[in-house]
Amino acid sequence: MSKTGIMVCGHGSRSQEAVDEFAVVAERLKAHFPETPVDFGYLEFANPVIRDGLDNLREQGCDHILAVPGMLFAAMHAKNDIPTVLNTYAKKHGIKIEYGRELDVDPKMIAAAADRIQAAIDEANAKWGERSLYDTCLVVIGRGASDPDANSNVSKIARMLQEGMGFGWVEVGYSGFTFPLVEPCLDHVAKLGYSRVIVFPYFLFTGILVDRIYGFTDEAAGKYPGIEFQKAFYLNDHPKVIETFAERVREITTGSNNMNCAMCKYRAQVLGFEAEVGMA
């Protein structure tokens, strides 16, 4: 009789705190699947690696594994690297591994982000006094990727947060790979005339990049003393994030887990990336 297990595949980080946070998310996912073994592993930079997590599930008798990428958006790691590891393992050990999709643009993820931002607003109001959101600029900082589809999703989420919460304006920056980077983004925002700026890293976990985002925010506060710069907490293990992970697992069993490939540079001739069609 076939036995099913769940595998959460993370990128990995050199930050032990980030690695620990990912493990907590994987642990909390178990509450949604109390009868199913759940394990996790990382693509690089940390242990256990994905193969170790798969070994653990196989040792528990699992021969059918539902694997999901522990990532916000689908770029190279979620589209290429993790599937390569999973397919190689499945072929070697003769088991069935089905792969789900990334967290993506989802109402639950936007709700989680809004909660983090609202907590930052409340903290700013307690620190400096009440201020209208119409007089506040939201800055959403994404990871940044070589995939324009993933980058554009950060902009979409930022706009939905701005319009949904009522901010006067929103700007988007990235920690790497694409532009604008964090420091020039904050310099630009300082010229827009807003007296308060909320900086929200749209990241799942902490790490060097989140630390840098907060560092650039502190530097901007020093450079522009007339503006209130408030840092928001990243997503981490917000209950809505865990719910989204659980939904991605369930999608595999219902056959509704396909990634949106309409704007994937590996599948279609996306403007400026025509030469990368078929590289996946």
Tell me the role of every PLM-derived stretch.
Residues 1-280:
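Active-site-proximal alpha-helix that buttresses catalytic centers in soluble enzyme cores
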